[in-house]
Amino acid sequence: MERPAFRARQLPVLSLAAFVLSVPVLAAPTYPWRDQPVDAASTLAARVAAPKGFQRAPAAGGSFAEWLRGLPLKPDGAPVLLYTGEAKARQDVHVAVVDVDVGNRDLQQCADAVMRLRAEWLYSSGRAREVAFNDTAGKRLRFSASAQQDYAAFRKFMVNVFAFAGTASLERELKVVEPQAIAVGDVFIKGGFPGHAVLVADVVVNAEGQPRFLLLQSYMPAQEVHVLKNPKSEDGSPWYGLDFGPQLVTPEWNFGRTALRRWP
């Protein structure tokens, strides 16, 4: 008996537009203190190139790492300004200035700037309910749920955090992490009165998996957040390596090797 001719099943044809629409699109990082979108050419990742032979470590979409890499920088050569609007006395410690306001009070210093950036990321990611920090006495300061859609209220809350929290309280609420496991968003911190804290703003790795990292800081008195130079670098690179021995030497503070912390 003759078999019927085989006929291929016709499948629906999807247009390119339909395919594109079916792929989820991750929103670009946002920076609520800005009125305008960030120019891609002015971001930290665009302006501070990875050293030769290194590539930026992977970062998930929407992560703190992605957000930090997208931070807007002021034009090349910009000075670090104090909260008073005056130039900081030392202009030899930075390679770039982050385009984020410092306020008009002597509050947004070292740990304050670290907490500000962490909180801004949470707020901009729709996670304002997670914005909370311990004060020096150990009390948990939480952003009011009733004000979570109000950026002005968020900024007012952060001023309160700056007044009652600092390096001593922040160090206690962060988790100890070994330098070999360093990641974007980690913090080198020494709690005290005074103490100091710097934020790991980026991490790159080479083919052998060896990392290098960038650091951000504010300092005393309150001043603009800036990308630190590496005073030990022989070629002027701002990238730090893990071969720093018992102390991590930064331009204005030295940290012990056990000073690295991570957000819980």
What does each model-found stretch correspond to?
Residues S218-P264:
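Low-complexity, Gly/Ser/Thr/Pro-rich intrinsically disordered linker/tail segments
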Residues P29-D99, Q108:
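Cationic-aromatic interfacial patches
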Residues E2-S15:
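Bacterial N-terminal signal peptides that target proteins for export
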Residues D99-Q180:
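Extracellular-facing segments of soluble proteins and assemblies that are Gly/Ser/Thr-biased and enriched
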Residues I189-A197:
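Short coil-to-beta-strand transition motifs
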Residues A183-V187:
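Structural motif
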Residues P12-P24:
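Bacterial N-terminal signal peptides
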Residues K190, A201-L228:
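Catalytic Cys-His active-site segments of thiol-dependent hydrolases/isopeptidases
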